[in-house]
Curated annotation (Swiss-Prot):
Keyword Transferase assigned: yes
Protein family per UniProt: Belongs to the aspartate/ornithine carbamoyltransferase superfamily. ATCase family.
Keyword hit for Chaperone: no
Molecular function as annotated in GO: amino acid binding; aspartate carbamoyltransferase activity
Pathway terms, separated by semicolons: Pyrimidine metabolism; UMP biosynthesis via de novo pathway; (S)-dihydroorotate from bicarbonate: step 2/3
Protein name according to UniProt: Aspartate carbamoyltransferase catalytic subunit
EC number(s) recorded for this UniProt protein: 2.1.3.2
Organism of origin: Cytophaga hutchinsonii (strain ATCC 33406 / DSM 1761 / CIP 103989 / NBRC 15051 / NCIMB 9469 / D465)
Keywords noted in UniProt: Pyrimidine biosynthesis, Transferase
Record: residues binding L-aspartate: 87, 170, 224
Binding-site list for carbamoyl phosphate: 59-60, 109, 137, 140, 265-266
One Pfam family it belongs to: OTCace_N
Length: 307
């Protein structure tokens, strides 16, 4: 079996192009499995995985848990809100106590940038980063690449624009790294206040005009405004944001071109996307959710082979 070059999935930046190709190829095989009447395989039988989430999650947590069960792994779920973290226990103490129960792998989401990288220096178990602050969300980028490949036949040479709150998005950074490693052209589009100053150093195009960005791209990956991470006001109102940066059917129809619409969720309908776009034939948003299970199965399976 081919192996990944890494023991942990901490970020896309750490992966080689071959790593990404291996994950997506393996995910394709697992997608066939989960569409069968019997959806489980014994690949991770006797492997115990802890989902350690310090931030709220719906799609990512459910997707990881389902991926683990499809692989026949034993799964335990940790919620910070109901734990000794509330009593002052440190992150490392919390995780070491979980590992003392003979857990083999940690899937972690944390509000602090670099939290999984810190753990990787102190523990022996495999770690999967399910999102660290505004830094990276590697499995989201991998499932996005898988979905583009499935829809358009490949990623290389495609023009992908990431729209919205780039400044506070961990999805944006992971996608930029993943897309570039696979030969795609990448652009970001949003208000100047929500585009980080360093973004040009990553070799991506920057556009502030929504219509021009849509005319350029084959794929629009649309991000929500992350109000929970904003400490100052970056634009006057959500209504004004929607007026200048919201994608609606009328706008798409006027472009007279096919654009694939993606969104990592949750969608703020009527803000970054209108319902008639989110639910249209342009959208592969629910395909992304479906593909997330297969991609996370691939990540867990391949990491389990890299002790």
């Amino acid at each position: 079996m081919s192996q990944l070059s890494v023991k942990h999935l901490l970020g896309i930046k750490d992966l080689t192009t071959k790593d990404i190709e291996l994950i997506l190829e393996t995910a394709g095989q697992f997608k066939e499995v989960i569409n069968r009447p019997i959806k489980k395989v014994p690949s991770l039988r006797d492997v115990t995985i802890a989902n350690v989430f310090f931030e709220n999650s719906t799609r990512t947590r459910l997707s990881f848990e389902l991926a683990q069960k499809r692989l026949s792994a034993d799964t335990i779920n940790f919620s910070a809100a109901a734990s000794s973290v509330k009593k002052g226990e440190t992150l490392l103490d919390t995780v070491n106590n979980i590992l003392a129960m003979k857990v083999d792998m940690i899937v972690m989401r944390h509000a602090s940038v670099g939290a999984p990288h810190f753990l990787a220096k102190h523990i022996s178990a495999n770690i999967v980063n399910a999102g660290d602050g505004t830094h990276e969300h590697p499995t989201q980028a991998l499932l996005d690449s898988f979905s583009i490949k499935e829809k358009l036949g490949g990623v290389a040479g495609k023009k992908v624009c990431i729209f919205g709150d780039i400044l506070h998005s961990r999805v944006a950074l992971s996608n930029i790294f993943a897309l570039q490693k696979q030969g795609a052209e990448v652009m970001v589009c949003g208000p100047s206040t929500l585009i980080p100053k360093f973004i040009g150093e990553l070799g991506v195009k920057v556009e502030f005009d929504l219509r021009k960005a849509l005319q350029w791209c084959d794929v629009a990956n649309v991000l929500r405004i992350q109000l929970e991470r904003q400490t100052i006001k970056y634009f006057p109102t959500l209504r004004e944001y929607a007026q200048y940066y919201g994608i609606n059917k009328q706008l798409l129809d006027s472009l007279n071109k096919e654009i694939v619409i993606m969104h990592p969720g949750p969608i703020n309908r009527g803000v970054e996307l209108s319902s008639d776009v989110a639910d249209s034939g342009h959208s592969i948003i629910l395909d992304q959710v479906e593909n997330g299970v297969a991609v996370r199965m691939a990540v867990l399976y391949l990491l389990a082979g890299n002790k």
